Amino acid sequence: MSNFIFGRYLPLDSVVHRLDPRAKLMLSFCYIIVVFLANNIWSYAILIAFTVGAILSSKISLGFFLKGIRPLLWLIVFTVVLQLLFSPAGGHTYFHWAFINVTQDGLINAGYIFVRFLLIIMMSTLLTLSTQPLDIATGLASLMKPLRWVKVPVDTLAMMLSIALRFVPTLMDEATKIMNAQRARGVDFGEGGLFKQAKSLIPLMVPLFMSAFNRAEDLSTAMEARGYQDSEHRSQYRILTWQRRDTVTWLLFLLGFVAILIFRHW
């Protein structure tokens, strides 16, 4: 649980940290779309270069991103193996037995899927590590302003997102404390097969859910005591302003996007 870093903010002074949260949110969303548009090694080389440049600009250690990948590593490996073993025939066949078919195209596609997972996870991790949860909520509310014309509760949704992001690392820390307490009582969460390991997590889930409900109730009581009204319009302590660095970042991304489109049909 200590390796789970999604939702954590790492306060540093870097170009990425100073970017407008709206720019980072839109860029992250478009980045994921572009990742699925890439279909050759040159396209992925551009995406990798952009991602590495963003990580270096953020001044965040690579170890944090590896921690972000570790909890999802089993899902990545499982998906890659499925693609590798059960891909349709195409290119040179390296191994064939019954319905298992390892081909050249399957190997290439498995590699692409592996890189896609890594790029998306690393960019999502960079977004949360370099942006405070409140800034993410504020940026999202600003981007969703047009939805107010169709009576969508934008401020409420932004508040819910902010609270959810803020509580993710808190609940992970709580889960770590509960697991350590149960290990001290002799519980081994890594013993046995997959089913037995999943069953051993049941004593963890009950106190974790109780803790989550108690924290949610305490938070709602504190908000009501401070006069929070969901329907009231409120000003922002920090006004978002689009800076030159946001424009430059987007121009670099658009330049890479155009290059990927060119390589896609090359």
Curated annotation (Swiss-Prot):
CDD domains: EcfT. The chain crosses the membrane at residues 32-52, 71-91, 107-127, 152-172, 246-266. It is found in: Cell membrane. The keyword Plastid does not apply. Keywords: Cell membrane, Membrane, Transmembrane, Transmembrane helix, Transport. GO terms for cellular component: plasma membrane. It comes from the Bacteria. It is a multi-pass membrane protein. GO terms for molecular function: transmembrane transporter activity. Its main location: membrane. Belongs to the energy-coupling factor EcfT family. Transmembrane (T) component of an energy-coupling factor (ECF) ABC-transporter complex. Unlike classic ABC transporters this ECF transporter provides the energy necessary to transport a number of different substrates. Forms a stable energy-coupling factor (ECF) transporter complex composed of 2 membrane-embedded substrate-binding proteins (S component), 2 ATP-binding proteins (A component) and 2 transmembrane proteins (T component). May be able to interact with more than 1 S component at a time. This is Energy-coupling factor transporter transmembrane protein EcfT. The lineage of its organism: Bacteria, Bacillati, Bacillota, Bacilli, Lactobacillales.
